[in-house]
Structure formats: structure tokens, C-alpha cells
């Protein structure tokens, strides 16, 4: 363990071996940091915060400080960050609130670029990339393998399905389906995230079926009727099933649909 002499670490904080902590870091009493974590200078970590193995936290990040929610009155809530995440300069990640289940949860192998913000009660999956200056509003759900471009913004309670891609400067006010490509302010569906699917080596057969199903699902604004008309046509395609399940889940925001020109 290497802790710079100019850092302030509360005696009750649980710091594992093989952790490196740079100068002018402040760590509170209820913080738990796992093995092989690197905390660069001028980082503040507070609250009931758990940080998993191998994370790297860069200068001026603020982790676990009180939620930006006027209803929050100091309740004991949590922030749980998984393994091997990279948290760049000026990133802010807030813990949960009683109104949202009390936990903000970050998965594994994510990249949070400079000045991105994860608000209270968010659920971030694995292998997510959130680019510079992107705020995720409270209670937001970002599933696995999502990429969100710079200066986009995600509305509170909005969901972004797995392997979706959000273009830079997009205002996400509606739920984006798995494998979707969403652009614009306010956001609309541009189509399927073909680049992301090919990067994951998804067989072309499944991509073609997904594209056909996408056209059927969004051929009119009546999604329920369109889903019923599929009548199990793509029941063996897990990609299509992911979209159907996503649309049918309980939701706070409407589903993002294609732009009607």
C-alpha cells in the first residue's frame, strides 16, 4: 500500500493492500477500496462507497458525495462500483436515495470520461463507455456495452438498452432499445447499431433478422400492435427477443422511435 503523506484517509476506511493513493486525496470513514486500485491526486471519496479491484480514479473526481436531490435528507445510502473501471478527471458519481432503492450501482470495465456525471440511483452495466461531459440523470439505467457520445445527456428515469449507441450531443428523453442507434435533440432512432454488433462478432444471419424485425416493430406508432403481428416470427433470435422484452418492461419514459420525415 502506498499512501501519499499529504492525503487524508479516515482511520475507519477499509483500504486493501496494493492500493496507490496520491497527494491531497480525501477518503471518508465508510469507504471500502479493493485491491490494485489507483487513486490519483485531489480525489474525494466519501459516503458508504465500495470500489472494486483494479479501478483507476483520476484527479478531481468526486465519488460518493451527497445526491443532487432536494428530497435527500442525509439517509444512509450506498454507491457500489465494480472492477476495472476508469474514472477520469472531474467525474462525479453520487450514491442512491431512499426513493430509488438506496443504491447507485456501477458494473465492471467501464470508462467514464472527463466531467461525466452519474446521478443518484443509476444502474450502469458492464463495458459501458460514457464520453466527456455526459450526465446520466437520476434513476437512469444504462445496460451492458452501451456507448454514449460526448456532450449527450440522458433524462432521469430513461433507459438505454444493451449495445445501443448514442450519438454525440444527443438529448435522450426516451428509452432507447437494445442494439439501437439514437441521435438528435430530442432523440430519435436512426436504426440498428450495426457497427457495435459487428464488433461483437454477431453472425450476419442474426443481424439481418434483427434488421427485418426492427422494420416491423417500428412500421407504425402502435408498438403493441406491431409486436403482436410478429407472432413469434423471430422467436429463436435472442437479439429480437431482447428488444421485445425491453419494450414490454415497466417504464417511466416512452420508447424512442424512428424520426418521421
Stretches found by the model and what they are:
Residues 1-6, 11-12, 17-18, 54, ...:
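Terminal amphipathic alpha-helical/low-complexity segments used for targeting or macromolecular assembly
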Residues 2-188:
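Structural signal for interior beta-strand "rungs" in well-ordered beta-sheet cores
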Amino acid at each position: 500500500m502506498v499512501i501519499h503523506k499529504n492525503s487524508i484517509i479516515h482511520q475507519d476506511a477499509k483500504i486493501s493492500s496494493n492500493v496507490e493513493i496520491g497527494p491531497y486525496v480525501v477518503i471518508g470513514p465508510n469507504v471500502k477500496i479493493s485491491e490494485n486500485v489507483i487513486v490519483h491526486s485531489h480525489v474525494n471519496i466519501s459516503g458508504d462507497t465500495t470500489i472494486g479491484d483494479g479501478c483507476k480514479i483520476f484527479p478531481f473526481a468526486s465519488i460518493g458525495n451527497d445526491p443532487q436531490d432536494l428530497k435527500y435528507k442525509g439517509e444512509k445510502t450506498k454507491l457500489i462500483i465494480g472492477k476495472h473501471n476508469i474514472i477520469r478527471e472531474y467525474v462525479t458519481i453520487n450514491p442512491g436515495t431512499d426513493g430509488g432503492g438506496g443504491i447507485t450501482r456501477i458494473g465492471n470495465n467501464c470508462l467514464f470520461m472527463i466531467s461525466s456525471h452519474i446521478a443518484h440511483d443509476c444502474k450502469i452495466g458492464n463495458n459501458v463507455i460514457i464520453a466527456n461531459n455526459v450526465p446520466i440523470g437520476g434513476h437512469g439505467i444504462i445496460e451492458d456495452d452501451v456507448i454514449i457520445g460526448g456532450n449527450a445527456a440522458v433524462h432521469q428515469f430513461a433507459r438505454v438498452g444493451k449495445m445501443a449507441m448514442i450519438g454525440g450531443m444527443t438529448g435522450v428523453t426516451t428509452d432507447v432499445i437494445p442494439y439501437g442507434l439514437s441521435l438528435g435533440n430530442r432523440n430519435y432512432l436512426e436504426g440498428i447499431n450495426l457497427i457495435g454488433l459487428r464488433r461483437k462478432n454477431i453472425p450476419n444471419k442474426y443481424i439481418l433478422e434483427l434488421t427485418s424485425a426492427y422494420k416491423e416493430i417500428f412500421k407504425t406508432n402502435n408498438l403493441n400492435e406491431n409486436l403482436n403481428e410478429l407472432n413469434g416470427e423471430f422467436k429463436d433470435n435472442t437479439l429480437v427477443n431482447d428488444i421485445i422484452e425491453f419494450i414490454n418492461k415497466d417504464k417511466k419514459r416512452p420508447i424512442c422511435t424512428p424520426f418521421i420525415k
